[in-house]
């Protein structure tokens, strides 16, 4: 029994140091990116490296734009480093216009990662308003007849139209339902909840 107990303690110790190392690696990588962005004098959303190994940045309407502020929020949560709090708020609030996006379904990715984590970790009241407005924007994509949230618009000679699609719905859309459930909690309005459930059904 003694031997088994010490094995378990060693495993816990190894696992903890692995987690701590992962957090430290994340802190280093995100810190380097913050330094790079800050040196540019702009507020940018890094996505990946392009073919020239340069950082590719996206605008607020890109489906990936909330991931960087979300990562900073998670790092703040894991480290309690208050310098990250102001950075997370800055990069989150740079996405303010995303709350008005109605031409694609990805608003849940954008807003939940950034404002959702910001509300959860900072309690800033204005983040609640952004979440609810974003949920309203997402609800404009709900189509009564099929009971789903349409992923993309289909118009003219778009690639969606060329495929004969009328109301495309992709699995990613399920990740937007969290925004609707949260909007019901924040507002007390069950409309968001009902749309989320209809889509899931």
Predicted regions and their residues:
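A general, composition-driven signal for non-globular sequence regions
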Residues: 3-4, 111
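Glycan-recognition and catalytic cores of secretory/periplasmic carbohydrate-active enzymes
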Residues: 10-201
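Bacterial N-terminal signal peptides
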Residues: 1-3, 92
């Amino acid at each position: 029994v003694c031997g088994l107990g010490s094995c378990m303690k060693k495993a816990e110790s190894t696992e903890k140091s692995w987690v701590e190392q992962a957090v430290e690696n994340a802190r280093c990588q995100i810190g380097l990116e913050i330094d790079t962005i800050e040196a540019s004098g702009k507020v940018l959303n890094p996505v990946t490296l392009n073919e020239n190994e340069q950082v590719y940045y996206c605008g607020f309407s890109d489906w990936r734009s909330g991931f960087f502020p979300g990562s900073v929020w998670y790092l703040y949560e894991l480290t309690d480093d208050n310098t990250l709090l102001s950075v997370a708020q800055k990069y989150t609030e740079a996405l303010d216009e995303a709350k008005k996006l109605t031409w694609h379904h990805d608003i849940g990715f954008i807003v939940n990662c950034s404002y959702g984590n910001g509300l959860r970790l900072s309690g800033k009241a204005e983040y609640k308003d952004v979440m609810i407005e974003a949920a309203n924007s997402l609800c404009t994509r709900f189509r009564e007849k099929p009971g789903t949230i349409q992923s993309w618009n289909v118009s003219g000679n778009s690639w969606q139209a060329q495929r004969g699609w009328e109301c495309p719905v992709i699995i990613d859309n399920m990740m937007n339902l969290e925004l609707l459930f949260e909007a019901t909690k924040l507002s007390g309005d069950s409309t968001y909840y009902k749309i989320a459930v209809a889509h899931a059904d």
